[in-house]
Amino acid sequence: SVPGPMGPSGPRGLPGPPGPGPQGFQGPPGEPGEPGSSGPMGPRGPPGPPGKNGDDGEAGKPGRPGERGPPGPQGARGLPGTAGLPGMKGHRGFSGLDGAKGDAGPAGPKGEPGSPGENGAPGQMGPRGLPGERGRPGASGPAGARGNDGAAGAAGPPGPTGPAGPPGFPGAVGAKGEAGPQGARGSEGPQGVRGEPGPPGPAGAAGPAGNPGADGQPGAKGANGAPGIAGAPGFPGARGPSGPQGPSGAPGPKGNSGEPGAPGNKGDTGAKGEPGPTGIQGPPGPAGEEGKRGARGEPGPTGLPGPPGERGGPGSRGFPGADGVAGPKGPAGERGSPGPAGPKGSPGEAGRPGEAGLPGAKGLTGSPGSPGPDGKTGPPGPAGQDGRPGPPGPPGARGQAGVMGFPGPKGAAGEPGKAGERGVPGPPGAVGPAGKDGEAGAQGPPGPAGPAGERGEQGPAPGFQGLPGPAGPPGEAGKPGEQGVPGDLGAPGPSGARGERGFPGERGVQGPPGPAGPRGSSQGAPGLQGMPGERGAAGLPGPKGDRGDAGPKGADGAPGKDGVRGLTGPIGPPGPAGAPGDKGESGPSGPAGPTGARGAPGDRGEPGPPGPAGFAGPPGADGQPGAKGEPGDAGAKGDAGPPGPAGPTGPPGPIGNVGAPGPKGARGSAGPPGATGFPGAAGRVGPPGPSGNAGPPGPPGPVGKEGGKGPRGETGPAGRPGEVGPPGPPGPGEKGSPGADGPAGAPGTPGPQGISGQRGVVGLPGQRGERGFPGLPGPSGEPGKQGPSGSSGERGPPGPMGPPGLAGPPGESGREGSPGAEGSPGRDGSPGPKGDRGESGPAGPPGAPGAPGAPGPVGPAGKSGDRGETGPAGPAGPAGPAGARGPAGPQGPRGDKGETGEQGDRGFSGLQGPAGPPGSPGEQGPSGASGPAGPRGPPGSAGSPGKDGLNGLPGPIGPPGPRGRTGDAGPVGPPGPPGPPGPPGPP
């Protein structure tokens, strides 16, 4: 028969009831599986948010005083500086130069060395040891002649730091010596303890305001001034008592956010941490009931592999089920995790082998259907061969307890089987019927251990991340970086621009005079003072009338009565614009503007004039004598010469010339850092550098706010009096009493333009009337036009100091300065450590053979000198007869260095003599003359951090370095916001 197509996969069945068999024993724990290999690296995550701005860094250590540079060429004379603010209290003067080194006085008692600091935990600095007691100063001896420089001894190990002696009395100023070669830069010392702050100096009194001067024309750029002569150094002042702590200053304005710093160098890979402790193994879960094979679900996401579970015990033996009808072959389900090995089932009946069906096409993954009815149990198939034990799968989740099933039917009694081996005790069985008491059997031995499980398959995903290892020991403290050179003193910032003065309001335009009214025929009686009427609109000027004929002169009228004081007339029209006002007084200084944006880096400026040479620092205390050197290397074995007779001791030769300095030895490894010296006093402020080029004009500021109402303008000048009309004809009879004023007539229409008449005779001035009452306030005039800008006011006092600006980008390195003038010689320093062994000098000329002398007397034993460098083999003298070996006398005193003798004839080569015993190392001699500075060697390897108490005494304070060149003027920043409007100027 042809097999039909493969049917769809059935729905997943419900979990079956648990079998009636008893629960199996808990199996022994399985061996822990091997850790799975790391999975592939995941995709790179998105970049994290930018980090917060770091906290403000701590203040840097005080810079080491720079080496004294050569004085630069004389610069051009600088512009006269503006008057500075009252200066603060100056520093104490430097101590005077010491004279020539005197003979050492009797040494004071040596102070006990301070106890060294305790070594702290790794990475943390231990507490600093207490300083030893201060030794008494020895009496100052007379100034002795300077001795010749001895050869440099070998460097001994650094001795412990002794107590610092008190400073000696200042000696007389010695003659100026030649400038020595530039010494190599010393190693960085540890940061010293910060001293207590001194009391704040008194604030200087503000000077009186000067009279406003006239604006002068900008003067031409003056030549740079010559550097001033260095003042005589003062004596060291006694250290004053520490002043009380000054009041805390007002918090400064919040600075702008700093730009992100350059990425730091990649740090060294940290030490691999120790593996974390192994986690506690969890208890094994109970074996779940085997459910029916469900339909294949959609593949889920790859999960992380769980920890290897313990090996489960064997399950309970189930009852064989009844044979069911074989169903159609379903699709292959997913490979399940192998369950615990069950007991071997009883063999079933062999079924007929079915015909092999054709493999069906793989169907699409269907959605999970609703659960179908339970199918009938099929007949058991033939027993297959025992398969290889599968790899242990990951532990399954603990299943929910199944519904208690119904007990199965009681099976027929089977044939008794063969007696099996005694197994491990089973779980308690169900209570059976009471049987006969049997004989107690002996307890069987424990069963053999099961075979070790095979290694499970590698999980699809990387394992869980292990617990973090314990923290490693703290790393050693790094070597402190070299102290930076103190920066140049910045040039004084420019004074803030003075705010513009407000413009005075423009005076209004004067209105035209009104037309003259008609002259009355006769003078009426003065009427009552009327109330001031409303201000009428300004009329146009009427046409000028024709000049009438001159009438006859009338009789002189009687003098009229004094008029009553009239009411104040209406406010006149605004007068014409006044002339520009005088120069106003300087207004108050405006508030400091906000900090401008950071400007772009400026162009490279011209080098500024060199600053004056600083004062020489106080001499450092004499160092402790160096440790005894180690024995030198044995010299090469020379050729054996015939022993000549011992010659007499010759007189000491004259002092020879100082030989040429040998080549510079190899650079030694960095020694322990010395103690930080006291910071040098601030050098004198050099002359201001030349002004930078003016930056481009900034963009125009925003339109100013609308100005307030201007002050009331002055009353305009009185208009010209009108022309006097012709006198009227004389009236008949005597002058009657004045009549009452008639009602005001209606305004007439303007008449036609008349012919311009001739100018009338100017009338006599009338009497001055009484002052009228103040008039009512007139309507506010229109805002005046912008007047001409006033002349610039005087320079106001400097405004308050603004907040510190952002640090500009580092400028380019300045050009190398010209060599400076020779400094005054410092006093002789203490003997330095023994230098590296130099190279062998050139071979000297052979000496002339000396005459054999009689053996000299045995001299007193002298101190062993430093081991000299191996000189070239000199010429051997003529072989003399072997003399008798005399007793070894004590070593004589070290003779003075003799002059180089004339070149002798080359002698015969002698036989090699026996090697003498190595001499004991001698005491350290005085320092030799410094050779010329060699090329800068490669940086040495970082030394291990030094311990407290082992550093040397503070060295002398070096002279302040020359003033660096003034940097270029940066670009002009954006204009600040407009200042508040100034006060109105005088009218």
Curated annotation (Swiss-Prot):
Localisation: Secreted; Secreted, Extracellular space; Secreted, Extracellular space, Extracellular matrix
Low complexity composition bias: residue spans: 23-41, 103-119, 137-155, 203-253, 362-388, 397-416, 458-483, 586-600, 613-640, 669-685, 714-723, 735-747, 809-824, 879-893, 921-954
PTM sites of type 5-hydroxylysine: K89, K254, K329, K553, K664, K834, K897
3-hydroxyproline: residues carrying this PTM: P687, P959, P974, P977, P980
Modification Phosphoserine, positions: S95, S589
Keyword Secreted: yes
Keywords associated with the record: Extinct organism protein, Extracellular matrix, Glycoprotein, Hydroxylation, Phosphoprotein, Secreted
Biased composition, class Pro residues, residue ranges: 1-21, 157-169, 642-654, 797-807, 843-858, 972-987
Residue segments, region Disordered: 1-987
Cellular component GO terms held in the UniProt record: extracellular matrix; extracellular space
Biased composition (Gly residues): 309-318
Highest taxon above the source species: Eukaryota
Modified residues (4-hydroxyproline): 15, 18, 20, 29, 32, 35, 50, 65, 71, 80, 86, 113, 116, 122, 131, 137, 158, 167, 170, 197, 200, 212, 218, 227, 233, 236, 251, 260, 263, 275, 284, 299, 305, 314, 320, 338, 347, 353, 359, 368, 371, 380, 389, 395, 407, 416, 425, 428, 446, 468, 474, 480, 486, 492, 504, 513, 526, 532, 541, 559, 574, 580, 601, 607, 610, 619, 625, 643, 652, 661, 673, 679, 688, 697, 700, 721, 730, 738, 747, 765, 774, 777, 783, 798, 804, 810, 819, 825, 846, 849, 852, 918, 921, 939, 954, 960, 975, 978, 981, 984, 987
InterPro entries per UniProt: Collagen (IPR008160), Collagen_superfamily (IPR050149)
Record bears the keyword Ligase: no
Database matches in Pfam families: Collagen
Quaternary structure note: Trimers of one alpha 2(I) and two alpha 1(I) chains.
Protein family: Belongs to the fibrillar collagen family.
PANTHER family: COLLAGEN ALPHA (PTHR24023), COLLAGEN TRIPLE HELIX REPEAT (PTHR24023:SF1082)
Miscellaneous notes: These protein fragments were extracted from an ancient skull bone collected in Buenos Aires in Argentina.
Function: Type I collagen is a member of group I collagen (fibrillar forming collagen).
Protein name in UniProt: Collagen alpha-1(I) chain
